[in-house]
Amino acid sequence: MLSFPNKFKCSSWYRPGRLFIVFIVVALALLTLSCQKSSLSNAPQSGKGGGEIIGAGSTFIYPAMSRWISSFQSSHKGVQINYQSIGSGGGIQQLKKGVVDFGASDAALDDKQLQEMPAVVQLPESAGPVCITYNLPELKSPLKLSANTLAGIYLGQIKTWQDPALRKDNPGVELPKYPIVVAHRSDGSGTTNIFTTYLDKVSPAWSKQVGKGIAVNWPTGLGGKGSEGVTGVVKQTPGGIGYVELTYAKENKLPVALVRNQAGQFVEPTADATTAAINAFSNDLAHDVRVPIVDPPASAKDAYPISGLTFLLIPKQGKDPNKTESLKQFVQYVITQGQDQAESLSYAKLPSGLQQQDQTLLAQVGSKSQQASSGGSQ
């Protein structure tokens, strides 16, 4: 019988029965690992099919949009939304190029623009005042501005704060001797569209010399990019005046002017005053949500005259059905529960009639039976 040195003797670990068991265990482990790897590669990833939803556009709506996104994502863990506050003009262009999944604009698309875009719906999701903010530390009471005075300032015709037109609007108020420094948007802006639509309506001189739109040739002033830029110019410049969404003025502790409406009332820019402006145009809006709500008639005595709707622009047929469905859920949230959040940020809640119109428009998103561009007349 052959003998081996002790170090070569078979230990109990190498017994044939044990070897068979080890082989089975190793084989099962390898099989399990292979199955796990296969299932991981085939399992839906977080956000797969939907991915990140990207929107861009209005700075006017950015404070509300940020709140909406945060609240929606807290209850929809698999959805990620990224909104880029680049101005309404930029948002429209990004959507037109297919770079983003939705746009936001304070300037509704006209018929020509709709024809140039992929099939989209545009639905109003909020409204708010474009406030006139200023930097006059010596002034203890709110500045009052009539339509002609405001137009004269932005035309460069009224150059100092002690101009007779300003004295007339503010009787008994000691106005400072500062020169007026006008601030305006330097980028394509829906806020500019609302503001210039107002000036175009109330001032024949403005209408003839400048007109209206998301970008105009300003007769005077310093340009700032975004509402943040305009706010910055005003805040840093004694004697400065600019137009921004109300939240930007509040956050920077800047005062806002009372603007005279057709009823002769100097009205503060508030959510309620914006709602009064919307209600003044309710019949027109029922036929076309794009109707401007600036300079309402004298019957709307409590209405703020420089108010505007802001719109979401949504492709009817997104590139990814899952992402489109998530976007629809987000918009549904915005036009329902999100309205209370908007109101807390000084935006006006949409009246029930506009909310119902929004539901009709939103139903067209993802519907293959609807291919024509929408968002104009109903």
Where are these regions (language model features)?
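Flexible loop/hinge segments at secondary-structure junctions
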Residues: 35-378
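Bacterial N-terminal signal peptides
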Residues: 21-32
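N-terminal secretory signal peptides that target proteins for export/translocation
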Residues: 1-15
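A general, composition-driven signal for non-globular sequence regions
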Residues: 9-12, 30-31, 62, 93
